[in-house]
């Protein structure tokens, strides 16, 4: 059985703008965190690792690189994009769906930011296909408009550099292991399984 659990990110607090500059009001990571793993206490960002679900949305928005993936690193993701770019189309998949070998795989597609769009464009990519699970039912997707934001980023990139990028989405079923985990977790949240542990633990 494959392990579909996602590892928490690592937080390097010393890099945070709020710590380095008393006047900073940055809330980018707080705004996108879907699990309340990030809190604001006395003007500083706090990280509750036990609440982190590993979606890595914070990595995509933090301007100071405060968050590090415990899955694929930024450098590793860049290498995957380089290696799996074929022709004019790049396919990127959510980890929780069945995917093809040629796809770049990330924990959550909200991890993809404008720098990845720029990298793909440099390799001649004109279309980026985002292969998702059922985002509307996923705990990681607090931001329901994330796809629209990616399309806006692509349009802004075009305006800056003149390279047209089309961002499209295909929705898939979750893979079998994750579907079971998700179903039983929801039962636990409703108290229907008492003290039983989540599937797969």
Can you name each region flagged by the protein language model?
Residues 1-27, 83-201:
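Non-ligating segments of multi-cofactor redox enzymes
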Residues 13, 35, 49:
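Aromatic-flanked redox-active Cys/Sec active sites in thiol-based oxidoreductases
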Residues 20, 46-49:
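Short, solvent-exposed loop/turn positions at domain surfaces
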Residues 24-46, 57-74:
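Iron-sulfur cluster-binding cysteine motifs and their immediate structural context
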Residues 32, 48-63, 75-93:
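Short microdomains enriched in Cys/His and/or Lys/Arg
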Residues 45, 52-61, 178-187:
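Basic (Lys/Arg-enriched) interaction patch that binds polyanionic ligands
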Residues 68-79, 196-200:
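Repeat-unit-sized solenoid/scaffold elements
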